[in-house]
Amino acid sequence: MRDPNNPCLFCNSKISGIAHENDLAYASYDTYPVSEFHCLIIPKRHVIDYFELTDEELVACNDLIKVIKEEILIKDKNVKAFNIGTNAGKIAGQSIMHCHTHLIPRREGDVENPQGGVRSVIPQKQHYKRKI
């Protein structure tokens, strides 16, 4: 994971608060959380985005997502749902060019209208009417 020739934040900084890890990935609570217990799941190998992950890395990351989810539900009984997402590319909002997946706990009332969930990345597309 550490490479002195790579300036990547996730490869070289001293990551504090590693919640869990396995051979291929680790989970760390976000320094700038959207909500309490917002967690990042990060592959140990330096890859730019989700589409570069191997099948084994995808499984390792998903395993950590499940572990962290259960841990959060034990810590905070008010968590009722989650958003899971990754930004792949600068135009999609990726600011650290090392793949990472956000696990964001959601609580009832944390936003006025949660309809559309991750669709809110483009605000005018967040709210919609079902055709069925």
Question: Could you describe each region identified by the protein language model?
Answer:
Residues M1-I132:
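HIT superfamily nucleotide-processing domains
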